[in-house]
Amino acid sequence: MSLFHYIYKILFLVILFTISSTCFSETISIKGLVFSDLKINEVFANQKITSGYLTIENTNKKDEHLIHLVSNFSEKTELHNMTVENDIMKMKHVDKGITIKANSKLIFRPGSFHIMFIKLLKPLKVMNKYKVIFTFQNAG
């Protein structure tokens, strides 16, 4: 597969997250992927890390694979998952991405999959919208 063909198959999505104690009510639908319940946890004084949550529904007939995230307000943006090992909750970086099965939903929530925004570059204000770029492998 040529580099051009590979790049062509990757879909970049810009999703706006809102910081608040409730979820952002807007639903965004692009290429058979539906994004809803967007939220970034509130950031307190001098805090340099926070997490984000959302629901991604794949309405396509093919599985989709979320392979990369980037934001303009943190040095690193990573996918993480919480697991229990020997009765201890552990958070792990998911470096190979996440598959969203065809015609199913993946819910990012506390205690499960979530997005980590690491080394925040600026204070995040409540009710402001922030850009996060999602890169998918197929997008339908």
Q: Where are the predicted features?
A:
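Bacterial N-terminal signal peptides that target proteins for export
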Residues: 2-11
